[in-house]
């Protein structure tokens, strides 16, 4: 089912927003912005009866234990204009395991009207165009803290053009890449925090209503039990205080993001920030002894090897250096460093980095590429041992709750490492090039329904040899026209081990010993050929070879399944909920603000 899409220039976006928010030359306070959009929506959107695709937000997917992104089909029963929401009735889901209430109150910006409508008399093209304007504004222009803006100041005059210009600069790579990636990360986190805040506050209000009703019933029907309830108040307090604590932490983080973004929103301050970063980098490079003259900073050199060691006993350090000696080419220059973060700040993309055992925290806003490598100073068998002590292994983790631990946009190699992804939403985002991983272990949090280990974007390829991927919602996600070669890879305790989102994704398991253990679903294949006799929309297969038989061009080999609830689940290409173009647009949209080089605004 095709959805409406719109390709517009940023000047068109600016004119559209100005047309909605023009107030005859008067001051437009932030508190009035939403009211103007409500009035515009009332004029343009059909009040009921139109079909659409609902892309379920991440916070709801997490709460309902659904994989993300999840999309469902249905129709709008009623538009709630005052809240810019709609009552959406679900009529079809992509996965039969998705269980949702039939009727849901959803935000209009989460809906994508379909081209094909049951009622041809409805003016759905105007409805779709209005939602597109609304979605662009509330996704890229309006910030969560704008509702607290002073009413005596003109919000449109101060922010509208500046923010659309910022979106344009980000999409056209006019900002220094570290700064651009940092700002995108801030924006993505702010949007997610706002969704989480809305969701938690709704839960708290519902809980308070329920508590009031219970107390009222207790006081009327059984007044003698009131003392008993008070006696257990300590236990109740511990339970109810958790959401309050979460709210406090989220509000605090939002305040930090706001203060930083309000500085970077100003073009002059952005330039000053970039110069400050550049000067700090030069000082760091000079202090590392790599260069003596500032002009040498711009000259490319041959790749070198960085050895990162944590404090330890002398004998331990000597043993690590002996191991490093066996891994470094004799003619290669070597730089000793204290932290991985410092190395990532000063190294070239083609440098080799060797890590000592221990925890290495990073907040890396650049990409890894150009045939560089990151390798742990340990034996390969130690990484994959079930009883391994992580404190004795080279572990890479995020310094805070970033959206993605590592972003790869070229050829790169990871070896003998533990990637601790328990505090990020995604372990590795592979944009293009070939990622080679040998003897690596990826750890998820084991509870999230949306966390991904490796995401392989269109045109990219990944080679995994002797790796362990465990405790993710999705171990490896293959997007269209991506490829993977897996050898002796173990998927353990994942909701979905390997995910193939379109029939053009190719996987080679030939000659390997891949295994799926204790996974809810071993392999998910979407839109693949199943033969003429297979007309069911969804099939569950016992072996990968049954799927490979009809897809010999892009699926090779076999694998083993142990204690999986379902081994291979296939969505027949004739039974897809969405057409390929629409499907891809909705799938890639969630990566638009997270470490992306080019934002495609639709």
Curated annotation (Swiss-Prot):
Effect of disrupting the coding gene: Some mutants display multinucleate spermatids, sterility and asymmetric contraction of the contractile ring with subsequent collapse of the cleavage furrow.
Gene: nesd
Compartments, as annotated in UniProt: Midbody
Coiled-coil ranges per UniProt: 188-208
Official protein name in the record: Protein nessun dorma
Pfam families registered for this protein in UniProt: SHCBP_N
Something else known: The name 'nessun dorma' is based on Pavarotti's famous aria from the opera Turandot due to the interaction of nesd with Pav.
UniProt keywords, alphabetically: Cell cycle, Cell division, Coiled coil, Meiosis
Cellular compartments per GO CC: centralspindlin complex; female germline ring canal; fusome; intercellular bridge; male germline ring canal; midbody
Molecular function terms, GO-annotated: carbohydrate binding
Biological processes per GO annotation: female germline ring canal stabilization; male meiosis cytokinesis; spermatogenesis
Organism, as annotated: Drosophila melanogaster
Tissues showing expression: Detected in testis (at protein level). Also expressed in ovary.
Assembly, per entry: Interacts (via N-terminus) with both members of the centralspindlin complex, Pav and Tum.
Cell division is among the record's keywords: yes
InterPro entries, alphabetized: Pectin_lyas_fold (IPR012334), Pectin_lyase_fold/virulence (IPR011050), SHCBP1-like (IPR045140)
The protein's role, per its UniProt record: Required during male meiosis for completion of spermatocyte cytokinesis and possibly also required in female germline cells. Also involved in ring canal formation in male and female germline cells. Not essential for cleavage furrow ingression but is required for contractile ring stability and the attachment of the furrowing membrane to the actomyosin ring in late telophase. Displays high binding affinity for beta-galactosides.
């Amino acid at each position: 089912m095709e959805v409406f899409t719109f390709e517009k220039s940023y000047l068109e976006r600016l004119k559209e927003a100005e047309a909605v928010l023009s107030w005859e030359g008067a001051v437009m306070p932030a508190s009035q912005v939403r009211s103007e959009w409500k009035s515009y929506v009332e004029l343009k959107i059909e009040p009921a009866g139109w079909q659409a695709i609902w892309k379920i937000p991440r916070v709801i997917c997490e709460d309902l234990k659904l994989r993300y992104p999840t999309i469902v089909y249905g129709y709008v029963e009623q538009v709630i204009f005052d809240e810019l929401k709609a009552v959406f009735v679900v009529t079809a889901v992509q996965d039969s395991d998705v269980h949702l209430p039939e009727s849901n109150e959803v935000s209009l910006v989460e809906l994508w009207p379909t081209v094909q409508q049951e009622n041809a008399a409805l003016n759905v093209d105007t409805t779709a165009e209005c939602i597109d304007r609304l979605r662009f504004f509330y996704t890229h222009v309006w910030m969560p803290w704008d509702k607290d803006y002073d009413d005596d100041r003109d919000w449109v005059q101060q922010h509208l053009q500046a923010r659309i210009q910022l979106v344009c600069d980000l999409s056209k790579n006019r900002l220094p890449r570290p700064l651009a990636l940092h700002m995108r990360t801030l924006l993505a986190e702010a949007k997610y925090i706002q969704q989480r805040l809305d969701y938690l506050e709704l839960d708290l209000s519902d809980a308070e209503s329920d508590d009031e009703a219970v107390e009222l019933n207790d006081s009327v029907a059984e007044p003698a039990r009131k003392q008993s309830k008070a006696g257990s108040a300590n236990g109740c307090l511990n339970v109810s205080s958790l959401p309050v604590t979460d709210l406090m932490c989220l509000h605090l983080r939002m305040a930090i993001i706001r203060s930083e973004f309000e500085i970077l929103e100003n073009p002059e301050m952005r330039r000053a920030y970039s110069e400050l970063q550049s000067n700090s980098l030069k000082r760091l490079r000079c202090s590392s002894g790599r260069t003596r003259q500032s002009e040498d900073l711009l000259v490319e050199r041959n790749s070198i090897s960085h050895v990162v060691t944590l404090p330890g006993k002398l004998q331990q350090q000597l043993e690590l250096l002996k191991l490093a000696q066996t891994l470094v080419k004799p003619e290669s220059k070597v730089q000793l460093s204290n932290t991985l973060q410092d190395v990532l700040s000063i190294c070239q993309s083609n440098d080799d980095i060797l890590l000592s055992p221990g925890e290495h925290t990073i907040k890396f806003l650049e990409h890894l590429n150009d045939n560089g490598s990151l390798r742990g100073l340990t034996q390969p068998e130690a990484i994959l041992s079930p009883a391994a002590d992580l404190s004795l292994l080279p572990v890479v983790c995020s310094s805070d709750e970033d959206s993605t631990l590592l972003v790869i946009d070229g050829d790169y190699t990871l070896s003998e490492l533990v990637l601790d992804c328990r505090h990020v939403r995604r372990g590795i985002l592979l944009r293009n090039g070939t990622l080679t991983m040998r003897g690596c272990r990826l750890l998820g949090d084991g509870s999230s329904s949306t966390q991904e280990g490796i995401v392989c974007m269109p045109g990219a390829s990944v080679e995994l040899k002797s790796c362990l991927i465990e405790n993710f919602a999705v171990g490896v996600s293959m997007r269209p026209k991506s490829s993977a070669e897996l050898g002796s890879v173990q998927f353990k305790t994942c909701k979905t081990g390997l995910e193939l989102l379109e029939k053009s994704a190719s996987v080679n398991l030939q000659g390997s010993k891949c295994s799926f253990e204790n996974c809810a679903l071993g392999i998910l294949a979407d839109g693949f050929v199943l033969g003429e006799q297979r007309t069911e929309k969804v099939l569950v297969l016992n072996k990968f070879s049954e799927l490979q038989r009809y897809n010999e061009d892009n699926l090779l080999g076999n694998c083993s399944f142990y204690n999986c609830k379902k081994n291979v689940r296939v969505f027949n290409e004739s039974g897809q909920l969405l057409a390929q173009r629409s499907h891809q647009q909705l799938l890639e949209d969630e990566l638009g603000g997270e470490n992306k080089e080019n934002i495609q605004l639709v």
